[in-house]
A protein has these predicted regions:
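Zn2+-dependent peptidoglycan hydrolase active-site motif and core
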Residues: 264, 277-323
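Acidic, glycine-rich catalytic/binding loops that coordinate metals and/or anionic ligands
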Residues: 194-206, 211-213, 221-225, 297-301, ...
Length: 419
């Protein structure tokens, strides 16, 4: 099992986009340490007594009071994207330990030799700074609150850095308590980069005109999903997961979209992306009516009807929102790449028919960690501007680029070759 899996490595402009959510996805379903040697020198605050400050050179080694604490949620992951850039993906957990709101003003990513690799600021920083669950972008961190800064560091093909560090700038309001804060800069944290090779898989659907309505790497409901696992860690189960919808012309459905049958992808065959074994199946969830998704009554219902395959040790392929009664496999069945597993549907919390697909390090849509992958080959035929979406018609910039061993980024339309 998994012998046919291939792996590849490509070598690494900072990118992000204002979070725009396509109607398809409502909720589709290591911390590091701050390096104390890297912090800036203490400058005594005017009005502070000499007795309270270190003397005789001890100030250089003293800890300093900061209004925030910053840690990485995980090591960084790398994927070669359809823009032909290497995307380094990770999240910085920022906790406000001050009595008033703190405003983040800049996150600079720094390489091992001190070179600046990228900087997140302004509107880009605002879009990338998300509350931990509610997907509310803002650079302001409320008192005693925590946010995640989602980093998408896109670098040209070349060597992938094994580690990066940061300079994080922030401001405080003019309040009396601010005098205890020694510096408005955090130097760090350091983040390890997982330079392992991305898994190469076949596509989960076939044919032309497939649009990624949610995917890595700019802000969207997949990239921004975070859940607590066992109360001990934050997991990112959908960073690289893709929601696939079929486009014809500039639309994803015919008519007014009031029925599932009007969607071009409804009933499309869902395919095994590699040889593997079925480890989980959920069926019996009824189809939703487009644009009227309701929260499920059970945890299992969040993915609607599902199939999960183990395609390699510690690598699980998850398919969700499948048509009821269409699943052709059962737990324990062995499958080969290209086998039909089910039909594309609209079950679970979904605003319209689509396929949710992703790789995980365990067979759990909530506490598994999303794994990067690339498809063997596809052609990018357009990119959708979701920010310009005002009605049923998509705003598409046409293009034609053939790619091998690449990941389809958020908003691209691709054609898959015949298998």
């Amino acid at each position: 099992m998994g012998d046919d899996l291939m792996r590849t490595r490509h070598g690494f402009m900072i990118t992000a986009a204002v979070c725009t959510v396509m109607f398809m996805s409502t909720a589709c379903t290591g911390p590091g340490e701050i390096d104390p040697s890297a912090v800036a020198d203490v400058t005594p605050t005017p009005g502070t007594s000499e007795e309270a400050m270190p003397t005789d050179g001890a100030a250089e080694a003293a800890d300093k009071v900061s209004a925030i604490m910053v840690q990485p949620i995980h090591d960084a992951q790398v994927v070669f994207g359809s823009d032909e850039m290497n995307h380094v993906e990770y999240e910085l957990l920022v906790v406000n330990v001050f009595s008033d709101p703190v405003t983040l003003t800049g996150v600079t990513i720094i390489g091992a030799d001190g070179e600046e690799l990228g900087k997140v600021e302004g509107d880009t920083l605002a879009a990338a700074t998300q509350s931990l669950y509610t997907h509310a972008p803002s650079p302001v961190v409320d008192a005693s609150a925590a946010v995640s800064v989602d980093i998408d560091l896109a670098l040209p093909t070349g060597d992938v850095p094994e580690r990066v560090t940061h300079r994080i700038d922030y401001t405080l309001p003019d309040v009396p308590g601010a005098v205890i804060v020694d510096d408005h800069v955090v130097h760090g944290p350091e983040v390890a980069v997982d330079t392992g090779e991305a898994i190469v898989i076949a596509p989960p659907v076939a044919g032309d005109g497939w649009l990624t309505t949610s995917a890595c790497c700019s802000p969207n409901v997949h990239r921004d999903l975070r859940l607590s696992a066992n109360g001990l860690r934050i997991e990112t189960a959908e960073t690289f997961a893709v929601d696939w919808a079929l486009v014809k012309g500039d639309r994803v459905y015919d008519g007014d979209g009031s029925s599932n049958e009007q969607f071009y992808d409804f009933g499309a065959e869902v395919l095994a992306v590699a040889d593997g074994t079925v480890v989980a199946v959920n069926d019996g969830v009824e189809e939703s009516i487009p644009f009227t998704s309701k929260p499920p009554e059970t945890k299992q219902g969040f993915g609607g009807n599902q199939v999960i395959l183990e395609i390699a040790p510690g690598v699980f392929a998850a398919y969700a929102h499948l048509q009821p009664g269409s699943i052709t496999v059962g737990v324990g069945d062995d499958v080969e790449v290209g086998d039909v597993l089910a039909k594309l549907g609209n079950t679970g919390p979904s605003q319209g028919p689509h396929l949710h697909f992703g790789l995980l390090d365990k067979p759990d849509l909530f506490t598994g960690r999303s794994l990067p992958f690339v498809h063997e080959a596809f052609t990018v035929v357009g990119t959708v501007d979701f920010a310009a979406l005002t009605g049923d018609e998509l705003v598409i910039a046409p293009e034609s680029r053939e790619l091998t061993e690449a990941y389809p980024l958020y908003g691209v339309i691709v054609n898959f070759p015949d298998q």
